[in-house]
């Protein structure tokens, strides 16, 4: 199995720590977008942006999302981690070029974007994974799948 990392270097401390862990995994860092775009994949994992995303996609993010969407159009299965990149978690507003996933695996509970009419179609099937957060720690009115 080939794994490719298609976004630039991480900027936050947590992202830097996890990025360093890649040294022990079979991951190819691809800085040549044209070379990556020329390949076809059976599956794509979208973990580009997280719950803090808002506004428009930056040029590199827009290009990465476009690549994932083209791969999906060519038959690749797209799995989004927590949410498809390019969607505001709280409002469901989808930026131009947001990823369209076949499956979105979210953690603990459904977020507003998973049910908002503007963004739910981008999620595909939604699976909520239990990660052990106790019920009493949930805010009132939190949606559960």
Name the predicted role of every residue range.
Residues 41-145:
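YjeF_N-associated NAD(P)HX repair module
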């Amino acid at each position: 199995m080939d794994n490719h990392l298609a976004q630039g270097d991480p900027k936050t401390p947590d992202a830097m720590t996890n990025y360093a862990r890649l040294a022990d995994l079979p991951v190819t860092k691809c800085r040549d977008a044209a070379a990556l775009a020329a390949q076809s994949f059976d599956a794509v994992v979208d973990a580009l942006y997280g719950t803090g995303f808002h506004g428009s996609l930056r040029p590199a993010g827009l290009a990465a999302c476009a690549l994932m969407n083209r791969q999906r159009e060519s038959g690749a299965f797209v799995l989004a981690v927590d949410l498809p990149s390019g969607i505001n978690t709280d409002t469901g507003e989808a930026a131009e070029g947001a990823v369209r996933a076949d499956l979105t695996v979210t953690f603990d509970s459904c977020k507003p974007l998973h049910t908002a009419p503007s963004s739910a179609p981008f999620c595909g099937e939604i699976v909520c994974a239990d990660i052990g957060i106790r019920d009493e720690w949930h805010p009132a009115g939190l949606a559960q799948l």
